[in-house]
Amino acid sequence: MITPLDAHGNIDYNATNILIKYLEGINVDYLFPMGSTGVFPYFTLKERKDFLKFVRENSKKPIMAGVGSSSINEVNELMKFSMDIGIEAAVLMPPYYIKLNQEAIYHYYKEILSSNDMDLLIYNIPQFTNKIDPETVKNLKSEFSSVKGVKDSSADIRGFMEMLSLSDDDFAVFQGQDDLLFTSLELGASGGVCGTTNFSDGIVRLYHEYKNNREMALKIEKNDVIPLMKKLGKYQFPNAYYEYFYKKNNINGGYRPPMYRVGIEI
Amino acid sequence: MITPLDAHGNIDYNATNILIKYLEGINVDYLFPMGSTGVFPYFTLKERKDFLKFVRENSKKPIMAGVGSSSINEVNELMKFSMDIGIEAAVLMPPYYIKLNQEAIYHYYKEILSSNDMDLLIYNIPQFTNKIDPETVKNLKSEFSSVKGVKDSSADIRGFMEMLSLSDDDFAVFQGQDDLLFTSLELGASGGVCGTTNFSDGIVRLYHEYKNNREMALKIEKNDVIPLMKKLGKYQFPNAYYEYFYKKNNINGGYRPPMYRVGIEI
Amino acid sequence: MITPLDAHGNIDYNATNILIKYLEGINVDYLFPMGSTGVFPYFTLKERKDFLKFVRENSKKPIMAGVGSSSINEVNELMKFSMDIGIEAAVLMPPYYIKLNQEAIYHYYKEILSSNDMDLLIYNIPQFTNKIDPETVKNLKSEFSSVKGVKDSSADIRGFMEMLSLSDDDFAVFQGQDDLLFTSLELGASGGVCGTTNFSDGIVRLYHEYKNNREMALKIEKNDVIPLMKKLGKYQFPNAYYEYFYKKNNINGGYRPPMYRVGIEI
Amino acid sequence: MITPLDAHGNIDYNATNILIKYLEGINVDYLFPMGSTGVFPYFTLKERKDFLKFVRENSKKPIMAGVGSSSINEVNELMKFSMDIGIEAAVLMPPYYIKLNQEAIYHYYKEILSSNDMDLLIYNIPQFTNKIDPETVKNLKSEFSSVKGVKDSSADIRGFMEMLSLSDDDFAVFQGQDDLLFTSLELGASGGVCGTTNFSDGIVRLYHEYKNNREMALKIEKNDVIPLMKKLGKYQFPNAYYEYFYKKNNINGGYRPPMYRVGIEI
């Protein structure tokens, strides 16, 4: 989920409601507020809580909430809050800013997992923060039963296959790059956490077609998903996702710096 | 300044006081709390304010406060708070996590500079966050008189020279890498913002010797600063800075994950 | 194909013959001498010609010859030589050493394609030399009918999909990374150019099973190919490929620096 | 030295003579044919020998010859040839194309140094080929007295300082980046191997002024060298160096692909 903004750069809850209804309509399995496409680092802790609360109160879909922060105190606070309001799962990437080795990343997750029982997806997105190695994921998974899977947005299929080798009935591996979903399903991925759902149903159709009609799924990937991803990829991430959503829904949306309006045609 | 921690990973104000007194004793010109060595992203907004306030109340040295956050709301809040309590200047790097182009970085600074009058140092540290180009610094400097300089920790001397070309009476360029201070002074740098000051006076002596005794300054660089930086550089940043400080002062200090204790000898 | 070496680091033609017979036995479609696994840059022009000639004279399999060099004169000489001795196709990566933009790469291929009629595969391997963009491949393909396809060893599936979008009856797209062959076939790849063939038939079985028994192919990938690639990947490339081949065939093989013997168990 | 080319992309010896006379006129200490600016990888072994021979026969200046190749046989041949014709020293970077660890690089140099007595400069240029660590340089220096120094073109001052720590009466450390020469001299560099000498005497004047008039040297760096380097840096390397030389001397010069003409104004 993007985090819709008004002309002043504040969260726009009317627009958020439109987004929630759209996502329910195209039949996603989970809502994922405050992820990277939701530009979570651009908001205060209070804004993040308010947004999670609004999504919870306005949808019956299961929710996985982005709880990322380099500060373990903030992560703990967001996890407890999310659990209290009935959110089903949390999604957490390694800390950002300071470059970290795997030992540091392990200490971070261990501390958080030791003080929270909430189901957690580990989020690997090395473009934006420190990479978590499959080996570290494996160790955390073996020590904490609340670690329920991984969302891998690395776009590195070799690394993704290593994550997939950890899959079992209690451990899911999700692809975070829309244009790699078909390939990932072929290799055994549990599903996708995909940003184009904010304004397009192609990726959901691909996912649902896949089981019965592999050829059709591949066709959707090639004809719908890849061209859309290429188009979005020409702009500073994730500004085009917002503009696309605003334009499609005739919303007078805005941007909070460092975000800015880009000229994508829909 | 590191942010000294106790055995539970909370800020240790007794230790902070020891640190302040040491820095005053070796005669630094400014205190710089909540920078990268101070692991500012590992703290909550409240912890950051409390720490800034403590430093302000316990030293008469001028202070430049790290106010970094990807959230402009948090930056604005930290700047207003800092100004209110009498802190002299703020230090701000570009937003982290999402990879940004220069246009995005410009929008971010512009928004913040438009709503704050506090003197600001721009902080370039591309190892940890998006790089700010000298061209963007130049544009911001020409539009906002509150932009008083840049702290460059890139370790890229060619880029540093480009920053130096912006120097004038109202614009200072500081070197953020201790082992490059001598070279930077030769090229015209205004000074350094140097992490080894937390437990060693070599870099301050180098700076003061430089004007009168260039050879002595070079000797300190080669014999004291570079070997110390190499030793510290063997460990996950900035854990060794903390351990060094704890050991030197016989403090039973601690770590907040992702930080952890490393075995440096002092 | 590796380029088998004797204890003095010279090409070992007896061992080469053993290799040719093995490759024929496991039923590869083409032989590919003097590629990256064949460490072509470690040989003189004369050694390269001699090796190509030996392979040509000792096998009736179609051959694609690595003709890479940053010097267009050397490439032209190798292509003419290869064509004269009846080699079916050439494989050529962009020039290495000096970092090049796409315009430079285009000029290089254009010059070579204008003076040679031999069928050519473009070789994308950005780990080792300048990357060639799908757009540049597309331009070369549209101008020169002798451009018959691309070998992509980038391990970047997103880029590979872009290459695949150029596929047609006269343009083949090959995967150069063994552990990505299954995935690539799913996406429509024409086949693979795979280094583990030097001592293992898994990847060939995978390829042949794929058309009739996709599940079996996936099983081979997971049980045979990926574990083998991981094992090989622990050593300085491509030393372990050589040692594996030597040990398997009880050959007293050697290395030419910068190659050296590694301790892989087979 | 660039390698001047005629309109057909062949070496232009008349132009080479003009270049030699110019370099003698501005009083460089050494000629350095077949380095990176000389695009040595774009030539055949015979062309490289012919060029070295021509330079030797047409100048009494000491010469250091670029003998780089990933093939140790080619390096050995070039070194023996150079020694035979009276060239004073060889310059050699680590092998390119295949990514190598330090052990591989060590094996390569060791093999070459064991079979040649010629004085050698190790050439570090990680932008174009595998990086050689100061530690590896140190080991080679301690084992082979023919290792007389290092040319470092990395533009990494921290690494350069590590190379400088190896300096002694028998081991020189040269800066390969013109705009970093002043800084490097300050730190104790032996001198520079600088590409702008092909058409400009600024860097030579800087070097000669440095000993007596440090301020003048710094002025030349800021007013002449840095602006020239910035201008050249806007184009695909090293095309602008060639065009500049051609234009300045009214030579109808050419390019061998992947080189091409760029529109620099002189």
From Swiss-Prot, chains A, B, C, D:
Keyword Lyase included in the entry's annotation: yes
E.C. numbers: 4.1.2.14, 4.1.2.51, 4.1.2.-, 4.1.2.21
Active-site residues, Swiss-Prot/TrEMBL: K151 (schiff-base intermediate with substrate)
Site (Proton shuttle) residue list: Y123
Pathway assigned in UniProt: Carbohydrate acid metabolism; 2-dehydro-3-deoxy-D-gluconate degradation; D-glyceraldehyde 3-phosphate and pyruvate from 2-dehydro-3-deoxy-D-gluconate: step 2/2
Entries under CDD domains matching the protein: DHDPS-like
Binding site for substrate: S36, T37, Y123, N124, I125, K151, D152, S153
Pfam family, one: DHDPS
Annotated GO biological process: glucose catabolic process
Coiled-coil region(s): none
Top-level enzyme category: lyase
Keyword Lyase belongs to the record: yes
Family assignment from sequence similarity: Belongs to the DapA family. KDPG aldolase subfamily.
Protein name as annotated: 2-dehydro-3-deoxy-D-gluconate/2-dehydro-3-deoxy-phosphogluconate aldolase
Organism: Picrophilus torridus (strain ATCC 700027 / DSM 9790 / JCM 10055 / NBRC 100828 / KAW 2/3)
Lineage of producing organism: Archaea, Methanobacteriati, Thermoplasmatota, Thermoplasmata, Thermoplasmatales
